Design a protein with these regions (language model features):
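Short S/T/G/P-rich N-terminal loop/turn motif that feeds into the first structured element of a domain
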Residues: 1-49, 85-99
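An amphipathic, aromatic/His-enriched active-site/gating alpha helix that lines ligand/cofactor pockets
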Residues: 35, 57-89
Length: 99
């Protein structure tokens, strides 16, 4: 299952600005990259907006929650299950969106 994570933090909690918070980011990123139940698909940062966009693949949400929880000390996150657009278009073509 694919999950898209959007993490947002403020300038006051930014790990790039506050060295003591950098350790939290490093530990969270390492957990995402090394947890066997999680595969990082893509990860991007919008540094001027203090936002991370991370897409991961995992069997369920529990492993993602465990790996991402430390980052909640720096800001907030939205985690959404997502699917490839090509897969959605196939479903729509099969009538999945019709009542």
């Amino acid at each position: 299952m694919l999950f898209h994570i959007t993490h947002t933090h403020s300038h006051e909690t930014c790990p790039a600005v506050h060295v003591d918070r950098r350790k939290t980011l490093d530990e969270c990123w390492e957990a995402l990259r090394t947890t066997p139940e999680i595969r990082v698909v893509e990860a991007y940062a919008a540094p001027l907006d203090h936002i991370f966009h991370i897409t991961v693949e995992a069997d369920d949400l529990a492993a993602v929650v465990k790996a991402m929880s430390p980052l909640n000390a720096l800001g907030s996150a939205q985690t959404l299950p997502v699917m490839p657009l090509d897969d959605l278009l196939l479903l729509v073509g099969e009538g999945a969106s019709r009542p």
